[in-house]
C-alpha cells in the first residue's frame, strides 16, 4: 500500500487532488487508516477531465517547464519547444474573408514574423507532411474545408527585418541577397518544362547575383508568374517588416531611392497581379498609400486600433 504523496508523484498530480479522489471513492481499493489514506500499489489512475487537461499538474511532479518563445520566429520550433499561444484561427479568418492583400501594422515584439511563418508553413507545398504541425491546433478542428487548404500553395516569403544599412547601395545589395535566397528555395523552376527559356535566364540572373536594380524591382512579379506556370496555381506572397528599409532610408538620407524601388517592387507583386492567391505584409508603420501602395485598391489594413 502507498500513501497519497507517493501516488501523487507517480501520477503527476498534487497530493491534495489524490486525497480528494480518495474521498470521492474514485480510487479502487483506497482505505482510510487513521487520518491517512492507503492506496493499493497497483491502483489505476482514474479518468478525470481535470486531470487529463493538465490543470492540476505540478512542475515538481515531473512536468517539464517550457521557456517563452522570446525572439523565436520559426513556427515549427516555437510550437514544439516553447510555450505557444495558438494563433491558427487567424488562418480561418483569412479563408473566410478572403482579402486579396492584407497589411498588418503592429509594434515590435508583437509576434508578426512568427505569425507570418505560421501562414507559410500552413499553406506552402512541401515534400514534408506539414499537417502534423497543425493537427493539435484550433484550425484543425474547424472542418475539412480548412484542412483541405493546408500545404496546397507555392509561397514566396521575404523578411526585411535585417535590412538596416547606412546607404542605398548597401540596402540594395542586401535586398539582392534576400531575393537570391528566396529564388533558391524554388530551384524546381530552373529545370521546369513549364518555364520558358527567357524566364530561366532571368531566374539564373537572380540566383547568380547578377540582377540589376530594374531586374530586382520586377522579381516578385516574375517569380509569381513562374510559380503559377509550374504548379498550376498562383502563389501566396508574404512580406515581413516591409517598412524596415523605408525607415532606414528616411533616417539615412536615401528615402527617395528606397520609396521608388519599393513602389515598383510591390506594384508588380500586388497590383493587378493575376498570379497571386493572397498577399500578406507586416510592418510597424502604415506608409502613406500614395507613396508606396499607389493604385493598390485591394489593400486591407489591420492595425491595433
Predicted regions and their residues:
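Short polybasic/polar patches that bind polyanions
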Residues: 9, 23, 229
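Polyanion-binding surface elements
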Residues: 1-17
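Short aromatic/basic micro-patch
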Residues: 1, 38, 84-85
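Phosphate-binding site recognition
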Residues: 59-305
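Ca2+-coordinating acidic residues in Ca2+-binding motifs
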Residues: 6, 43, 241
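A short, Lys/Arg-enriched interface patch at domain edges and termini
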Residues: 42-61
Amino acid at each position: 500500500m502507498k500513501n497519497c504523496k507517493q501516488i501523487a508523484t507517480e501520477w503527476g498530480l498534487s497530493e491534495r487532488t489524490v486525497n480528494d479522489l480518495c474521498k470521492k471513492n474514485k480510487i479502487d481499493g483506497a482505505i482510510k487508516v487513521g487520518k491517512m489514506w492507503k492506496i493499493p500499489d497497483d491502483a489505476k489512475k482514474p479518468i478525470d477531465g481535470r486531470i487529463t487537461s493538465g490543470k492540476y499538474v505540478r512542475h515538481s511532479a515531473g512536468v517539464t517547464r517550457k521557456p517563452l518563445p522570446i525572439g523565436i520566429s520559426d513556427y515549427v520550433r516555437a510550437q514544439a519547444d516553447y510555450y505557444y499561444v495558438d494563433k491558427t484561427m487567424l488562418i480561418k479568418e483569412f479563408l473566410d474573408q478572403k482579402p486579396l492583400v492584407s497589411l498588418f501594422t503592429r509594434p515590435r515584439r508583437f509576434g508578426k514574423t512568427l505569425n507570418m511563418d505560421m501562414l507559410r508553413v500552413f499553406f506552402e507545398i512541401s515534400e514534408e507532411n506539414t499537417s502534423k504541425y497543425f493537427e493539435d491546433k484550433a484550425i484543425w478542428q474547424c472542418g475539412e474545408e480548412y484542412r483541405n487548404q493546408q500545404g496546397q500553395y507555392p509561397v514566396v516569403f521575404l523578411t526585411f527585418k535585417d535590412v538596416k544599412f547606412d546607404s542605398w547601395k548597401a540596402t540594395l545589395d542586401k535586398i539582392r541577397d534576400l531575393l537570391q535566397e528566396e529564388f533558391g528555395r524554388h530551384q524546381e523552376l530552373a529545370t521546369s518544362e513549364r518555364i520558358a527559356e527567357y524566364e530561366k535566364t532571368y531566374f539564373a540572373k537572380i540566383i547568380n547575383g547578377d540582377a540589376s536594380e530594374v531586374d530586382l524591382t520586377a522579381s516578385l512579379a516574375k517569380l509569381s508568374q513562374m510559380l503559377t506556370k509550374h504548379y498550376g496555381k498562383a502563389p501566396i506572397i508574404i512580406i515581413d517588416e516591409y517598412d524596415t528599409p523605408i525607415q532606414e532610408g528616411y533616417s539615412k538620407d536615401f528615402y527617395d531611392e528606397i520609396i521608388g524601388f519599393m513602389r515598383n517592387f510591390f506594384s508588380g507583386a500586388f497590383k493587378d497581379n493575376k498570379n497571386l492567391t493572397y498577399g500578406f505584409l507586416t510592418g510597424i508603420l502604415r506608409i502613406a498609400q500614395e507613396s508606396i501602395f499607389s493604385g493598390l485598391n485591394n489593400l486591407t489594413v489591420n492595425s491595433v486600433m
